[in-house]
UniProtKB/Swiss-Prot annotation:
The lineage of its organism: Eukaryota, Metazoa, Chordata, Craniata, Vertebrata. Expressed by the venom gland. It comes from Dendroaspis jamesoni kaimosae (Eastern Jameson's mamba). It comes from the Eukaryota. Keywords: Disulfide bond, Neurotoxin, Presynaptic neurotoxin, Secreted, Toxin. Belongs to the three-finger toxin family. Ancestral subfamily. Orphan group XIX sub-subfamily. Disulfide bonds join C3-C24, C6-C11, C17-C39, C43-C55, C56-C61. This is Toxin S6C6. Pfam families: Toxin_TOLIP.
């Protein structure tokens, strides 16, 4: 699985996930306004006034 991850210049860098990491995730902390993209082992989608998380399982789906 390949996912996007964040770097200094934004969240468009590609990374190859480990065998344990089955999901790509995109998270947004609405309080700090920080984004995080990357590979995760488990993922539960969430959307509240302060936090957003989207999970997916296909290559580069977490744009």
């Amino acid at each position: 699985l390949e996912c996007y991850r964040c770097g200094v210049s934004g969240c468009h860098l590609r990374t190859t996930c480990s065998a344990k990491e089955k999901f790509c995730a995109k998270q947004h902390n609405r309080i700090s306004t920080l984004w995080w993209h990357g590979c995760v082992e488990t993922c539960t989608e969430d959307e509240t006034w302060k936090f957003y998380r989207k999970c997916c399982t296909t290559n580069l789906c977490n744009i």
